[in-house]
């Protein structure tokens, strides 16, 4: 696919992809509460869609793979009247330990990035609280995002609405100080999917991780395990980056 190289083309692609709003997150439910005011979308010029978490009125946190590998990225939300809005990115910081080939090579990677927007978000968006809590196996967290509810759909119409789902923390490879693994305790195939990367994973009222990856049964890519990068262990890097931008994250 040819890369799109202008905001106009990005807007046209967005209009086609999101012409018919649909649900997001496999097996999730619409989330219209506080969490929805702390999240928005990231669009890439290669057609990629991700979710991002608001840290300040012009700063977002997302997965590193959402803002690397293409020439253009935009933050997206819908105005009160439903009009699509695209915001340009002024700066981005990718975690120094991010490895784009980590999945294929099974190397360690911290799939995390921060982006600063060229203009502030509307007042209806509020900064999320990041949490250092170390949720362990058996704990229940909420995963949310703008991703697809049907991974077989290639039109983009099965994504674009903010949904959330409760999942159980699992430790298939033992405790991890970097990653958080989640599974549907009811074995109904619920979880994150394409478009949910960078979205919040919440315990209580704090974001403990950002979605980064999913697996599925058989030929599917979603519905088995959902993975996130923990934000607590990366606090030093997050705080230092935001300080350089004259911003501060909220922690609990």
Language-model segments: which ranges?
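Chymotrypsin/trypsin-fold serine protease catalytic domain
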Residues: 108-112, 117-189, 224-225, 231-240, ...
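Bacterial N-terminal signal peptides
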Residues: 9-17
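Conserved catalytic-core segment of clan PA serine endopeptidases
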Residues: 25-35, 73-123, 127-133, 172-173
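C-terminal subregion of chymotrypsin/trypsin-like serine protease catalytic domains
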Residues: 32, 38, 48-49, 54-68, ...
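Short conserved beta-strand and strand-loop elements enriched in small hydrophobics
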Residues: 40-43, 71-84, 139-145
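N-terminal signal peptide c-region/cleavage motif recognized by signal peptidases
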Residues: 19-21
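Solvent-exposed loop/turn segments at secondary-structure junctions
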Residues: 47-49, 60, 66-68, 99, ...
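Bacterial N-terminal signal peptides that target proteins for export
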Residues: 1-9
